[in-house]
């Protein structure tokens, strides 16, 4: 009985302690540092993983992996990342297995899969897709960065962020904050440029950042705010995930 009680308490307290650690860094300019050089941490079939002091970087070859969008947290996938807000309903277009789950909104950009083609682009998405996830923010369009977005007040706030894009070879790239990687939108867009992204969109950052990777001997994950923390804070659960398999 004591062991059961200890286990239950541990399962409740540990995620909250993790949240406290994650957010003790939040908006603290003293911990913000320029992004250093990325190092290759893992290379598998169709994927390379690089890490630096602010970001984890996942580069996928679309000829060797498959992509999708799920309205619930995926299991058994190589990689997944939350791609929407913590609302009861998703914001923007969401398509899962060819079924539209949420309507598109104006502006922003899209990650989508149509047949054997996976794409990331600003502004438009085909009417008929197998999978799609929309964001209200775009960061890089045909190699040009969104300087107007970078100048906005919210863009200068230090928080956990991400950018999803493709390079000139068609590889799909996920750049996501790791533990302590509180950055501005300018920081994450510039990292996208360094990694060769020519089309890139930004999905919700801050408490929304959540991802997991597992392939071969290498695994890593990061959740900016645990499920317990979301419940206490009044946030809903994520409604949309992009995944790779």
Report residues per predicted region:
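Gly/Ser/Thr/Pro-rich low-complexity, intrinsically disordered segments
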Residues: 13-245
